[in-house]
Amino acid sequence: MTGVQTCALPISAVASAGKSHRLTTKYAATHYNNAYEFGWDKTDPFRRSADFTLSPWSVTFDGLCHRPGTFDIDELMGMPFSHLEERVYDFRCVEAWSMVIPYNGRPLRDIIKVVEPMGSARYVAFTSVYRPDELPGQASAFSTLEWPYVEALTLEEAVHPLTFATFGVYGDRHLPQNGLPFRITVPWKYGFKSPKFIVRITFTKDRPNATWHRENPSEYGWYSNVYPSISHPRWRSEDVV
């Protein structure tokens, strides 16, 4: 896994690593989630997300780009939700479980090119929403994470054709337990590298300090690519179900 991976994904790589599975049921994929903004239990995102405000939602682009700005979620989609592309990707968690999920969205690179990253931009940081009044996990005195959540990719990874700006799952855009209304899905990486509830995208020259990597770099490598031949320190990658 993560701690032993020190190189970025070659740009020619594809999301074919791992086993092939049938589609996970929508019920399973929406009732067993990691979204620590709602709490640490797998059922917390479903149970505690009813009052989470999905609309209005906007995303700010800043940093090393020629056309910074703030865009409404519908502007980012660029088309009616029903016309978005559907992609089926494996979602692999560092906890040694996985799901096969249909995501609705468009290539992230199509959005990134609109804001025109500068030649000096090498990384992209994704910052998630901070609303402790709506997100009990953020308000909890027992949370060990530093909020808001930040994850990052290299710019090369962010504009890879497989990196997916995601606005829905199973044809449904109203599932905050799955990180909606706007998240990124990166199929060749472990799940925590696919940030949820994104409200800011920042282009940088220096490598951002991502949340989980900052918390425990030996467990959560900065790249965290899924290589079936390279195992996690505590389990074999090929055993991820």
Describe the role of every protein-language-model region:
Residues 13-241:
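Structured, non-membrane catalytic/scaffold regions adjacent to prosthetic-group chemistry
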Residues 2-9:
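Short, small-residue-biased leader/transition segments that mark boundaries at the very start
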